[in-house]
Amino acid sequence: MEQGRPRSSLSLASSASTVSSLSSLSTKKPTRAVHKVHAFGKRNNALRRDPNLPVHIRGWLHKQDSSGLRLWKRRWFVLSGHCLFYYKDSREESVLGSVLLPSYSVRPDGPGAPRGRRFTFTAEHPGMRTYVLAADTLEDLRGWLRALGRASRAEGEDCGLPRSPARPRPGEGPGGPGGPPEVNRREEGRISESPEVARLSRGLGRHETHTPNSTVDLQTDTWSRRTRSPELFSPLSRPPSPLSLPRPRSAPARRPPLSAGDISFPARPHTPLSRIDVRPPLDWGPQRQTLSRPPIPRRGPSSEAGGERPPRSPQPRTPEQRTQSTQATSGSSTYLQLPPRPPGTQASMILLPGPPVDSALHQSLETDTLLTKLCGQDRLLRQLQEDLDKRQEEKEQLEAALELTRQQLGQATREAAASGKAWGRQRLLQDRLVNVRAALCHLAQERERVWDTYSGLEQDLGTLRETLEYLLHLGSPQDRACAQQHLWMVEDTLAGLGGPQKQPPHTDPKSPSPAPQGEESSERESLSESLELSSPQSPEVDWSRPSGGDRALSSPQSGVGSPRVSRASSPECRQPSSPLLRTKVDHL
């Protein structure tokens, strides 16, 4: 009696999401029971993969066994349509198993889950088997969670509505010959809804381009029609993007059965109900080009059997028309039910530059910073100039001491012991002179570098003063008061510095290598020792001296006994006393 009943389109559509992928195998072997439909299919019992469906994501995952030692096995997983297949390797030759994802809950495991691996997630269904998978990296985990979550949520929402376009062909599906009796018993409970649902099915079937074989084909065909217009498409049929984890969303409420008076056809017939077109993310452009070509549209058997007019192909429309039609059919409340988009894909949420900073505060900070740098460079220039003066005085003292040593060597050629000490003293003075000249070279280069920086700061300060003077004459009253205050600040700073610095003379001392600054104290000690050895009070100096030698050593004109040698007196000290002494020094 059950076999003679007319098959209801609602009963066929309710089971099409689970068994329609086995339509090609229904003539060879009986279909499994309804309560086994969502079970994990292995090897020969796995679902047949449709090569025309696009692949949303594929890659390596680790699957945990459901029994035994619960070992982890590495498998190649492919998400095609709304079905998850896995293979032994990436060649995808033979399917090891398949999982149909409608109504599955995909969630990541917490940090305290005793899984033994990182980046694990779980796919579970109430009253059915739970699958535990693990990714290699965090990016892979995000991509898989987003893809599987979208697939399961998209199918779960469509399950609450009548799937009249997904009507099985005659002789196929669970309602045909050899189908399970439980499906037929469910048809008896829904037979009262058949007229309304059939009328709705005929109305929606007029606008469909073709009738897919299964709910997976229906979802993919709808998605392929959306991809023809790159401006707008559905967020539920969008391919996954591994940018962020899927956001949780509450389960859709089951709607009451539609009546004949409530049936209204939307402005866009081929758009599924409760689905809103939104703008695609920026990162999905290159990924969409890699998808396979959608199947060629064909006329479904429903339109041929009913004798209705041929389907119309969707006409291209502008984004404004799409938005207006969507708002007219769905209402403003539908937009409130949409989940928030991930942060990485919010094309409309662009950070705009904030309001400009207060000009007075910015100008005050700029003036203060410029004056601070100028004072620092001025202090550094003065310190370098002092160091240069000290080194120059020390160099002149060493040159004067060397000149006296040469005179003493020319007079003490007869005594070998005294001559050896004089030669050692002369060598020490020469080394100190080389180090002082090297330090002079280093200080001169540093002064030139600091002077270049100081000149640049002076130019910036001049430009700033011109700007302040311009604001003082032509600015607003508030700007005038601020400019006057900054001008006073600049004038006070320049007055404290003593006016602009003068450019130092260019010095190019010849030096073999720069000397470190730490040797200054040792050089001064060596110089004092050498000067004490060359003084007349030293008991070691016993060679003969020319007449007036004591006066030459003690007189302030010689520059050796005085603590400070002037630059004017140094040329006189460097000249030998007579041409005969100069000849003897050259001979030595």
Curated annotation (Swiss-Prot):
<dbReference type="Pfam" id="PF00169">
    <property type="entry name" value="PH"/>
</dbReference>
<feature type="modified residue" description="Phosphoserine">
    <location>
        <position position="562"/>
    </location>
</feature>
<keyword id="KW-0597">Phosphoprotein</keyword>
<feature type="modified residue" description="Phosphoserine">
    <location>
        <position position="164"/>
    </location>
</feature>
<keyword id="KW-0446">Lipid-binding</keyword>
<dbReference type="GO" id="GO:0008289">
    <property type="term" value="F:lipid binding"/>
</dbReference>
<protein>
    <recommendedName>
        <fullName>Pleckstrin homology domain-containing family A member 4</fullName>
    </recommendedName>
</protein>
<keyword id="KW-0472">Membrane</keyword>
<feature type="compositionally biased region" description="Polar residues">
    <location>
        <begin position="211"/>
        <end position="222"/>
    </location>
</feature>
<dbReference type="InterPro" id="IPR040392">
    <property type="entry name" value="PKHA4-7_PH"/>
</dbReference>
<dbReference type="GO" id="GO:0005737">
    <property type="term" value="C:cytoplasm"/>
</dbReference>
<feature type="region of interest" description="Disordered">
    <location>
        <begin position="495"/>
        <end position="588"/>
    </location>
</feature>
<dbReference type="GO" id="GO:0016020">
    <property type="term" value="C:membrane"/>
</dbReference>
<dbReference type="InterPro" id="IPR001849">
    <property type="entry name" value="PH_domain"/>
</dbReference>
<feature type="compositionally biased region" description="Basic and acidic residues">
    <location>
        <begin position="183"/>
        <end position="193"/>
    </location>
</feature>
<feature type="domain" description="PH">
    <location>
        <begin position="54"/>
        <end position="153"/>
    </location>
</feature>
<keyword id="KW-0963">Cytoplasm</keyword>
<feature type="compositionally biased region" description="Low complexity">
    <location>
        <begin position="246"/>
        <end position="260"/>
    </location>
</feature>
<comment type="function">
    <text>Binds specifically to phosphatidylinositol 3-phosphate (PtdIns3P), but not to other phosphoinositides.</text>
</comment>
<feature type="compositionally biased region" description="Low complexity">
    <location>
        <begin position="321"/>
        <end position="334"/>
    </location>
</feature>
<feature type="region of interest" description="Disordered">
    <location>
        <begin position="155"/>
        <end position="349"/>
    </location>
</feature>
<dbReference type="InterPro" id="IPR011993">
    <property type="entry name" value="PH-like_dom_sf"/>
</dbReference>
